[in-house]
């Protein structure tokens, strides 16, 4: 099967974020709460269109992938997140980039997320 041309592929954006919380959280906790927050704020159909994925999370910082047309909705759903595992928490978006490499270099220097 032939690969799609780059112009026909789904375009993505990468949101660098930091977790501000009372207690540390794991990647699986963040995935669960981000999807729950997006689903309750946006609904199931729009959440599916956002195509949200948590790519990496270490030391309270990480990267989330989403559709390039749904960046605003994704940021809104992250802002609506107030609790992780029953403890007060919020995700602060540090910035948006078109590549994982640039998001890591620009927003997550010295953090070890996706570092070789």
Swiss-Prot record:
Record-level Gene Ontology MF annotations: ribonuclease P activity
GO CC annotation terms, alphabetical: cytoplasm; ribonuclease P complex
EC number(s) given by UniProt: 3.1.26.5
Keywords: Cytoplasm, Endonuclease, Hydrolase, Nuclease, tRNA processing
Protein's cellular compartments: Cytoplasm
Catalytic reactions on record: Endonucleolytic cleavage of RNA, removing 5'-extranucleotides from tRNA precursor
BP terms from Gene Ontology: tRNA 5'-leader removal
Predominant localisation class: cytoplasm
Gene3D superfamilies: Ribonuclease P, Pop5 subunit
Pfam families xref list: RNase_P_Rpp14
Family recorded in the similarity comment: Belongs to the eukaryotic/archaeal RNase P protein component 2 family.
Quaternary structure (record): Consists of a catalytic RNA component and at least 4-5 protein subunits.
Protein name: Ribonuclease P protein component 2
Natural source organism: Methanosarcina mazei (strain ATCC BAA-159 / DSM 3647 / Goe1 / Go1 / JCM 11833 / OCM 88) (Methanosarcina frisia)
